[in-house]
UniProtKB/Swiss-Prot annotation:
Transmembrane segment boundaries: none
Keyword set includes Transit peptide: no
Repeat in keyword set: no
Origin organism lineage: Bacteria, Bacillati, Bacillota, Bacilli, Lactobacillales
InterPro entries: DUF2129 (IPR016979)
Name this protein carries in UniProt: UPF0298 protein MGAS10750_Spy0325
Major subcellular location class: cytoplasm
Source organism of the structure: Streptococcus pyogenes serotype M4 (strain MGAS10750)
Amino acid sequence: MFQKQERIGLVVYLYYNRDARKLSKFGDLYYHSKRSRYLIIYINKNDLDTKLEEMRRLKCVKDIRPSAFDDIDRQFVGNLHRDETNNHQKGYQPPSY
């Protein structure tokens, strides 16, 4: 049966756009911004450490930043109610216009 792989997105900044093909072997190349010279690559989470080490060794890579998608609260239902109760507990008064 098919098992879902845990994946993570990496934003890889390059010195030159011509080096984008070299990085396509590390994972799934999702987006390439030629103007800003960065790539978005998705890789498996269990391979993250080894692939980051290999990518950082390349001379064409300026910087690598992992995605913060896992850190974001994606529970949108009830956010307004939760914020409203927190503001009332702190004594927050909305501005009067």
